[in-house]
Amino acid sequence: MTKAKVDNQLKNMPGPVSIKKNQSPWREYKLSRIANAKDTIGEITPGIDVYALTMGQFDLADVMEHLLEATGPADVVVATWTAAKADLDRAEVFLKDKRILSLRFIVDQSFPNRQPGYFNRLVNKFGEGSVVVTRSHCKFLLIKGGGYSFIVRTSANL
């Protein structure tokens, strides 16, 4: 397909279309040795766009907690290749104390066989409908609430 055909199709599509995101004037790049997500990410404001490289001193659950402080109760999707018991425990606490209104996990098809205990815990704690099993190595976090929609791309598992 030629560029002209693609451009024409995009022009005729209904609603907003985004092919390439222009650099945000609010984008911050950080290399952090700070020990927590809150101080590394900083204040949450509309239009925030932060790229943070860390030394592994905090995890995805810490990022989730900081973002949930900004949103208040929110709907959450976690895509992970594997999950640790401590992070599953934290997600359960966030759900019980209503920081998370709904929670869905997307996990790799190998997870049930690789980590049957953790997989069964996911299903038992959060419900069968809360776990999607597919071929995936993606790691991301989606949070929507309080007028915010966050997308967190990460190399870290939950």
Which role fits each region the language model picked out?
Residues 1-158:
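PLD/PLD-like phosphodiesterase catalytic module centered on the HKD motif
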